[in-house]
Amino acid sequence: MAVYLLAVAILFCIQGWPLGTVQGQVMPFMEVYRHSVCQPRETLVSILEEYPGEISHIFRPSCVTALRCGGCCTDESLECTATGKRSVGREIMRLSPHKGTSEKEVMQFTEHTDCECRPRSASGVNSRKHKRNPEEGEPRAKFPFV
């Protein structure tokens, strides 16, 4: 066993430790970039947020995994947006406290299949930066002699 551990230690010294195994190891740029681009990625989705009308039930688990668009775009005026979607089923347990029952069932969730960086909608970042109180009205030019 000691010989095996020594061989593994020598191998790691020659080839380097696998990524993420040693605290402080730096992830190479291309790997960082590949993980950060706009793409479908596994996301936890709350069942009650997807089905807000089901508040009288308890779900187990309370959230499920689904692929949703996420990641960075090359410009702040763009956002990662779904360009393709599909419906997927997830088996969950529905508990009805008022009836004292529980049953397994399949619920449908939207999953993103394709993503693309597209211009932000009117409610995006740019409009948030310049949002005004409706009572303020339109901005007016101020002149020193008025």
Swiss-Prot record:
The keyword Signal applies. GO terms for cellular component: extracellular space; membrane. Residues 118-146 are annotated as: Disordered. One of its GO terms (biological process) is vascular endothelial growth factor receptor signaling pathway. CDD domains: PDGF (cd00135). One of its GO terms (molecular function) is vascular endothelial growth factor receptor binding. Residues 133-146 have a biased composition (Basic and acidic residues). Expressed by the venom gland. Pfam families: PDGF. Disulfide bonds join 38-80, 69-115, 73-117. Residues 1-24 form the signal peptide. It is found in: Secreted. Belongs to the PDGF/VEGF growth factor family. Snake venom VEGF subfamily. Homodimer; disulfide-linked. Interacts with VEGF receptor-1 (FLT1) with a high affinity, whereas it binds to VEGF receptor-2 (KDR) with a low affinity. Does not bind VEGF receptor-3 (FLT4). Snake venom VEGFs that may contribute to venom dispersion and prey subjugation by inducing vascular permeability and hypotension. This protein induces an increase in capillary permeability after intradermal injection, as well as a drastic hypotensive effect after intravenous injection. The hypotension is mediated by nitric oxide (NO), which is produced by VEGF-activated endothelium NO synthase. Also induces angiogenesis in vitro. Like other crotalid VEGFs, this protein interacts with VEGF receptor-1 (FLT1) with a high affinity, whereas it binds to VEGF receptor-2 (KDR) with a low affinity. This is Snake venom vascular endothelial growth factor toxin. It comes from Bothrops jararaca (Jararaca).
